[in-house]
Amino acid sequence: MIMACHCTDCQTFSGAPFRAVVIMTRENITIDGDVSEYTKVAESGNERVQGFCGVCGTQVYAKAPDGSVYNVRTGFLEQHKSLVPVKHIFAKSKAPWIDVIENAIWHEAGPTSEQVKP
């Protein structure tokens, strides 16, 4: 299952209004390379092990302390554009403008400096 987490932890870690994750069990994951981990207490009160690429620091996953379930961050996956969340969690802390984002000005590529001046 793919979901978008709007908790304040995910907002802080990602620097974005939410973080998209795919929920997987350990036997369905293959990780190549070095992953650095640390454990923290999440907003939910649960302990979560955070996994980061040991080379570049990219967020790779969060997992339960027993390692049985992983929330794999979709942003670094090659197929991330096709991984559409079917569930949103922690709606109580979602950014209030998420509901109206389609009404904003969109650019097909990065705008020029002139276009983003206040």
Enumerate the language-model features and the residues they cover.
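A short Gly-Trp-Pro
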Residues: M1-P118
